[in-house]
Amino acid sequence: MSNFIPLNCKTHYSLQKGFCKNNLLASKCSEYGYKACGIADLESLSGAVDFHQQCKKNDIKPIIGCDFDDYLLFAKNKKGWFDLINYVSEPTLDNLKNFAANGNLICVSNKSNGFKKLFKKNHFQYDHKKHQVYYVTEDESDCHRIMLCSGMKTTIKKVNKLISDGKEVKNKEFFESSNFFLPKPEDVAGDFEILNQISEMCEEYEVAEKPMLPTFECPEGFEEDDYLTELCRKGWKKRLMSSNKIDTEEKKNEYGDRVKHELKVIFKAELSGYFLIVQDIINFVKRKDWLAGPGRGSAAGCLISYLLGITDVDPIEYDLIFERFYNEGRNTEDHISLPDIDMDVPAEYRDDVIDYIKEKYGEENVAQMITFGRLQGRAAVKEVLRINEAVSFSEMNAITESIPDEARISDQLELMDEKSIIKWTLENEPENLKNWCIMNEKGDLSGPLSHLFEQAIKIEGTNKSQGKHPAGVIISKHRLAAVCPMTTDKSGDPVAAFDMGDLETQGHVKFDVLGIDLLSKIMEIVNDA
């Protein structure tokens, strides 16, 4: 059997270049008998945390790397993981020299080009462009080409015409060959001792961390739990006693028991700091005489939020349940779930609020976060039809309008093993698509466009673009570029390059600051009155 190890896999976080999905990549590696697998996305670590978690589920050793075109870098250990994060955030020559000297990164390049001198025994000269994996199974090659065409803003027919005319075409190799899939070990000829050496040099380490809340500066003599309790006492007097809400012994006991229960849960989860940070931000907004939202979503079910002035809704008065907001049953020894309180502020003052947070916790410790635009349902079908030039524009619109918005069927999708809007439509509203595609009880597709619907189903969930989350702000106790890969938005402001779920896995704490136009309009009306 071959000693090949797939170390240069490109996931769909290599936007519109790679197509590997981490869950399928890890499960296929397990099925094929691989003991290790590596990813090296294009100047990105955005998919690394999810890849690591998927490999662990499948008993595969995860090897995390990054592709800088002329060379690959792999993390040898946890220190190397943080060195790689630092370098991806700031890929300068000085940083490369410094991190090479640390000895925790492995460099792979086709030519020496000075890398051997920098990395010494941690450098391997190897053609890293060979045996790249851009999609997991051979039948995904068409989907990969769809994503390439999407990035190139062209169609399959136009690319094939250019190739047949002998013209130069970007990504030409992927249109001429379907050999960029994950091979079985026995199908790869050659000696891959270098790949095995790299794999053996890379240790296994954890990327998941417990929540790393920034330290809230309490008044002298107070710890966070004590200060939260003190603020609850003040809120009790201000919001309950002054309004006669606890004018009977029964009511006093009801409110008292609720506060004690909520504090007990919050103390156990070590989340006092979270509430102190949120109330401090809301207090800043109110000191500026800006409107703050009265409380939206499940946060209105927390009495402590009401006592602290974070929300203006009394959960007991409206029979709102604390466990809808925070359920300690979701916590495990290895994972503490985080609360989610939306802080609504006038849209034009959102940047001022974020500037206040940066001033308080440090410019380098605060950033907004990335979000990925994924092809779902209608968008996936439309992309496939457009790039294949399969139907007229009007028919394409008729097809996509027959597929429901994700929001309308979100509850039903949660019950599906494979959350596919297209499959849900074919199964639950078959009349909508019967002229183009039909799905039988076994899940097989038929109809004039069935092969294109198969492509669209495979493409669902694929990253197409990246942007900035409209609300999420990360506040860290560390310099973010040292613990989280960073990118920038169009204005050059720092953006954390892990998505929301991966940031939480890594222990980063998200605070939602939403700019609400309606609050701006209300302020305008009040000020003009």
PLM feature spans:
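Alpha-helical scaffold/interaction cores of sigma-54-like transcription cofactors
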Residues: M1-A529
